[in-house]
Swiss-Prot record:
GO biological process annotation, one example: 'de novo' UMP biosynthetic process
Listed pathway(s): Pyrimidine metabolism; UMP biosynthesis via de novo pathway; orotate from (S)-dihydroorotate (NAD(+) route): step 1/1
Gene it is expressed from: pyrK
Residues spanning the membrane: none
Source organism of the structure: Listeria monocytogenes serotype 4a (strain HCC23)
Name by which UniProt lists this protein: Dihydroorotate dehydrogenase B (NAD(+)), electron transfer subunit
Length: 254
């Protein structure tokens, strides 16, 4: 973990209220798929950092890409960043996805919902680099909310589900996966809790990893704001920011 400043290379709105923020800094060297950064807004009245998932990184170039949706004052503040600006960053944080499994999987299904789609990109890139056959399933409310379909096709097959049917399959991600003829060797998923519950229920026998989206305050496990009950004893809890955000599906009670 490192508190540092990163410099803005570029920022672009790539979907409705969804921004692609490209940063450069030394902390990129320590990043792994599924981790996140805690960004500090520039406004003095916004005291809490905001957690943003790492979409991708290039350790040679020392750059990373964050995708986020403007939902409040903090992310609205980030959306005003431009080339050359600096931002106070804490990270990379959390335990990411396990991609070095034994035996190595031959097929992987990566399921993302909304702003849970970004961490699937780097994960898919690294799995594909290991020779794994990758399938992405991305869920959005509408076509105007969708992003990174073209980028993901470089590493696997991409399926889209939209609630209003304006792009891809009408419905939810599970309306896509229920038609797949075979189950994958491993599943990775990130998105809203209801989606993760549906994914977990749909593939009870498949090794599944879930990246949980919880509101965070500190990002380092000190404040207990982002807890999740353990599956084997719901009176005990994981700290999502420190113990996760990625967990085996059988570890957590959603």
């Amino acid at each position: 973990m490192l508190q540092t400043e990163m410099k803005v290379i570029q920022q672009t709105e790539i979907a409705d209220k969804v921004y692609e923020l490209i940063l450069t800094g030394e902390c990129v060297a320590d990043m792994s798929p599924g981790q996140f950064l805690m960004l500090k807004p520039s406004r003095s009245d916004l005291l809490m950092r905001r957690p943003i998932s790492i979409c991708s990184y290039d350790k040679t170039a020392k750059t990373c890409i964050l995708l986020y949706r403007v939902e409040g004052d903090g992310t609205r503040d980030f959306s005003k960043l431009s080339e050359g600006d600096t931002i106070d960053v804490l990270g990379p944080l959390g335990k990411g996805f396990d991609i070095d499994q034994t035996p190595a999987p031959k097929t992987a299904l990566l399921i993302g919902g909304g702003i849970g789609v970004p961490p699937m990109y780097q994960l898919g890139k690294e799995l594909a680099g290991k020779g794994v056959q990758v399938t992405f399933v991305n869920g959005f409310q509408s076509a105007k909310d969708s992003f990174y379909e073209k980028e993901m096709t470089a590493y696997g097959t991409v399926h889209i589900a939209t609630v209003d049917g304006s792009l891809g399959t009408q419905g939810f991600v599970t309306d896509v996966t229920k038609n797949f003829p075979e189950e994958p060797d491993v599943i990775y998923s990130c998105g809203p809790k209801a989606m993760l519950q549906a994914v977990k229920a749909s593939f009870p026998e498949t090794k599944t990893y879930l990246s949980l989206e919880e509101r965070m305050a500190c990002g380092i496990g000190a404040c207990y704001a982002c807890v999740c009950p353990k599956a084997d004893d719901t009176k005990k809890q994981f700290k999502v920011c420190e113990d996760g955000p990625v967990f085996r599906a059988d570890e957590v009670s959603l």
